[in-house]
Amino acid sequence: MFQGASALSLDAKGRMSIPSRHREALQQQAEGRVTLTKHPDGCLLLFPRPEWETFRTRIAALPMDAHWWKRIFLGNAADVEMDGAGRVLIAPELRSAAMLDKEVMLLGMGSHFEVWDAATYAAKEQQAMAQGMPEALKNFSF
């Protein structure tokens, strides 16, 4: 299970260093193989390959009225491998789609990660906090 937020920088080649606390898990779970794809909220999804295979199967099984979503998730997917330094190369097309420039946020979301442009994430988080808790969390005890 992946959790936590990490402020990271992309290098000049568009590579992102996976934090050391997640590298070992990605090596054990997926031998360093991950898949990146677009997310409709404007970020990227980063899956360990076994989790991606499960997600891909679920997306492929969607009915025809969701065909564009199949294109978005599956048609933009990029399989990559962590290099020896624990970096993942984010393709230029995916960097552009998520408006990733230099500063990014990597968010552990349980079975996968989200990769956000840092400024976009900060603005969306602030907006969500200003709107207050959604109904689904009203009775949630902390």
Swiss-Prot record:
Signal peptide location: none
Cross-referenced InterPro entries: MraZ (IPR003444), MraZ_C (IPR035644), MraZ_dom (IPR020603), MraZ_N (IPR035642), MraZ_sf (IPR038619), SpoVT-AbrB_dom (IPR007159), SpoVT-AbrB_sf (IPR037914)
Record's subcellular location: Cytoplasm, Nucleoid
Transmembrane parts of this sequence: none
PROSITE patterns (alphabetical): SPOVT_ABRB
A GO term from the CC aspect: cytoplasm
NCBIfam families to which the protein is assigned, alphabetical: division/cell wall cluster transcriptional repressor MraZ
Assembly description: Forms oligomers.
Family as reported in the entry's similarity comment: Belongs to the MraZ family.
Protein name: Transcriptional regulator MraZ
Originating species: Cupriavidus taiwanensis (strain DSM 17343 / BCRC 17206 / CCUG 44338 / CIP 107171 / LMG 19424 / R1)
Lineage per the UniProt record: Bacteria, Pseudomonadati, Pseudomonadota, Betaproteobacteria, Burkholderiales
